[in-house]
Design a protein with these regions (language model features):
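Hydrophobic face of beta-strands forming the core of extended beta-sheets/solenoids
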Residues: 25, 31, 35-37, 41-42, ...
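C-terminal amphipathic helix plus adjacent low-complexity
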Residues: 103-123
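Histidine/lysine/aspartate-rich catalytic loop segments that bind and position anionic ligands
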Residues: 77
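Nucleic acid-binding interface residues in structured DNA/RNA-binding domains
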Residues: 64-73
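Leloir-type glycosyltransferase catalytic cores
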Residues: 86, 91-107
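Flexible, glycine/small-residue-enriched loop-and-beta-strand segment within the central core
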Residues: 1-39, 67
Length: 123
């Protein structure tokens, strides 16, 4: 089987689709797109449906179409805070203890701002 064992016949992919570079998709990412080889999708990025990603997408950016940045999910200070506390790397127990915060963006941001040092200790 070809294509990671999913297709029985051989497929001759065009050269630009050849898998020769690793694609890196970071944490907290939503995708609905075509991602070409060699691209890194930053933490917290959103890639709109049918977007074609040919270059790296910055952390927390929202991209669409030809992966043009439409806007960012958060203000720069919140993005920097999230990069520092890296909540996606918190230990399982800490995540479980604070899982209710993930249902309310404002509560989550307030908690992280007020407890930054504690959050960093749980990475």
């Amino acid at each position: 089987k070809n294509c990671w064992g999913l297709i029985d016949e051989d497929i001759n992919f065009p050269k630009h689709y050849a898998i020769n570079k690793k694609v890196v998709i970071k944490n907290d990412v939503w995708l609905g797109a075509i991602i070409l080889s060699g691209v890194t999708i930053g933490n917290g990025a959103i890639v709109a449906a049918w977007a074609v990603v040919t270059k790296d997408v910055p952390a927390f950016a929202i991209v669409g179409g030809s992966a043009k940045i439409i806007k960012y999910r958060f203000d720069e200070d919140i993005i920097n805070l999230f990069k520092e506390v890296r909540w996606w790397n918190w230990d399982d127990l800490y995540l479980k203890e604070h899982s209710d915060l993930f249902l309310d963006k404002s509560k989550f941001i307030s908690f992280v701002k007020e407890n930054k040092d504690e959050c960093i200790r749980h990475i």
